[in-house]
Swiss-Prot record:
Physiological role: Part of an ABC transporter complex involved in low-affinity glycine betaine uptake. Probably responsible for energy coupling to the transport system.
Record: residues binding ATP: 34-41
PANTHER family given in the database record: GLYCINE BETAINE UPTAKE SYSTEM ATP-BINDING PROTEIN YEHX, OSMOPROTECTANT IMPORT ATP-BINDING PROTEIN OSMV
Taxonomic lineage from the root: Bacteria, Pseudomonadati, Pseudomonadota, Gammaproteobacteria, Enterobacterales
Protein name: Glycine betaine uptake system ATP-binding protein YehX
Keywords, ordered alphabetically: Amino-acid transport, ATP-binding, Nucleotide-binding, Translocase, Transport
Record-level Gene Ontology MF annotations: ABC-type glycine betaine transporter activity; ATP binding; ATP hydrolysis activity
Species the sequence originates in: Escherichia coli (strain K12)
Enzyme Commission code: 7.4.2.-
Subunit structure, interactors included: The complex is composed of two ATP-binding proteins (YehX), two transmembrane proteins (YehW and YehY) and a solute-binding protein (YehZ).
Domain of life assignment: Bacteria
GO CC terms of this entry: ATP-binding cassette (ABC) transporter complex, substrate-binding subunit-containing; membrane
Catalytic activity line of the entry: glycine betaine(out) + ATP + H2O = glycine betaine(in) + ADP + phosphate + H(+)
Keyword Glycoprotein in record: no
Length: 308
């Protein structure tokens, strides 16, 4: 879907990206992570030509991106950023409709798409005519993601999209993005500096340093088979057990024949999130519900200790 072949980028005399070779598979959720100044945001911005590469080739769906008109390329890619960038004097509906209007969609088609995306992102219909300043930070970011998805792009690019949000809202939106990716099957490339966010979201994880890829692969491989000491130290030896819990879901450890009382865990939660709730509630067993909110079993604290 998106292929970097020997790509480099300089800002003045400084090489921000050096001889980069990467392949983002169609339908994958890829996450770029690394040290400050590692080149991860530059790499993302080269995909939709917000930053032009100096050498090498970047191919999108088999075509070198420089052979495509910039507007055509960007209309095939949604883009969501930390600052959100909503138009302050436009309503939620108008913001979501930005790209479909540019593409001359019919009014009826646009209205249907707004309704569809607001439902998908968990935005209540009564927010449709509100303005950005009337929304919470989490709601604003959901509108930003809805706008990025509005024209049904082939690729969704996300640059630190949840960085300014509080931890609770951030966690909820991470869970939403996992669900949306599962439902839509879109190719997503996301940049973050947050290790836990990267581990929670990524199918394909790319660790960068000084403009180069240090290691890439699935998160489990990165944690358990680090390529060198830099990778090992970046992910943290002392936190390895807890971070491994981030890669497992409650659904994989549910005892489905059992039932219990109390506030339930969602089966799509990570074991790391479940561990926090066990500690907060001081109990040994918690009930579990499925995505429809129906009881589906229990999770035992002891099972988490075995996994960690």
């Amino acid at each position: 879907m998106i292929e970097f072949s020997h790509v480099s980028k300089l800002f003045g005399a400084q090489k921000a990206v050096n001889d980069l070779n990467l392949n983002f598979q169609e339908g994958s959720f890829s996450v770029l992570i690394g040290t400050s100044g590692s080149g991860k945001s530059t790499t993302l911005k080269m995909i939709n030509r917000l930053v032009e590469h100096d050498s090498g080739e970047i191919r999108f769906a088999g075509e070198e991106i420089r052979s495509l008109p910039v507007l055509e390329l960007r209309r095939r890619m949604g883009y969501a950023i930390q600052s959100i960038g909503l138009f302050p004097h436009w309503s939620v509906a108008q913001n979501i409709a930005t790209v479909p209007q540019l593409q001359k969609w019919s009014r009826a088609r646009i209205d249907d798409r707004i309704d569809e995306l607001m439902a998908l992102l968990g935005l209540e219909s009564n927010l449709r005519e509100r303005y950005p300043h009337q929304l919470s930070g989490g709601q604003q970011q959901r509108v930003g993601v809805a706008r990025a998805l509005a024209a049904d792009p082939q690729v969704l690019l996300m640059d630190e999209p949840f960085g300014a949000l509080d931890p609770v809202t951030r966690g909820a939106l991470q869970q939403e993005m996992t669900r949306i990716h599962r439902l839509l099957g879109r190719t997503i490339v996301l940049v973050t500096h947050d290790i836990d966010e990267a581990l929670r979201l990524a199918e394909h994880l790319v660790l960068m340093d000084h403009g180069e890829v240090v290691q890439q692969g699935n998160p489990l491989t990165m944690l358990t088979r680090p390529a060198n000491d830099f990778v090992r130290q970046f992910f943290g030896r002392s936190e390895l057990g807890v971070r491994l819990l981030s890669l497992r879901s409650v659904a994989d450890y549910v005892r489905r024949e059992e039932r219990a009382d109390g506030e339930a865990l969602a089966e799509e939660m990570t074991l790391r999130d479940a561990l926090s709730l066990f500690v907060a509630r001081g109990c040994e067993v918690l009930p579990v519900v499925n995505m429809q909110g129906q009881p589906c079993g229990t999770l035992h604290f002891q099972d988490l200790l075995v996994e960690a």
